[in-house]
Amino acid sequence: GTFPVVVGPGFGGVLFHEAVGHLLETTSVARKASVLADKLGEVVASPAVTYIDDGTLPHAWGSTEMDDEGRPTERTVLIEKGVLKSYMVDRPGPLLPGYPMTGSGRRQDYTFAPTSRMRNTCLAPGEARVEDLFAGIAFGLYAKEMGGGQVKPGSGEYNFAVQEGYIIRKGRLEEPVRGAMLVGKGPETLMRVVAVAQDLENAPGMCGSLSGAVPVEVGQPHVL
């Protein structure tokens, strides 16, 4: 069914990483294989959404001083208050007008050619209190812990298992649920974000793509 969902902090950010982050890599954008291609300066999310990729976070899994093409890493604001501000750009990226390099060229090892990749991505903290996210929900789902999932490249269509979830009734957590799945499209989900809490958490992991498996971090606060 369709009802409000509150996604927990930390590894909950894997949903945005997979369903949105990959759409903002110029590896996809340059081939027009992303539904977010050619949308710089456009509103692509709700005003509650600010999405950041930061290769400079101290001690984070995805941080290095230089990318695999010899450029310093940086903090890149990808989406700011709903507006698409930047892509993650590797060396071929500047061949496309208006795409400055962002130190995003990455690869697993010398057997792979670098491509644009995420490092440490997070949904920036908002102003809402966690309890306020639940308060107005008559019936919904709390996805406290996310599991694995699948994403269709280009469109951002996704389905993710909820590893630990609970029914929300009249703003209160009730019985646990098993077998719940979150299904949707990344760009549509961006537009439907209602509120973001203040309790940002990050979680480490590995990300696989054309240039192999690389260490990353995903992060977010509680999100409605």
PLM region spans:
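N-terminal small-residue-enriched
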Residues: 1-224
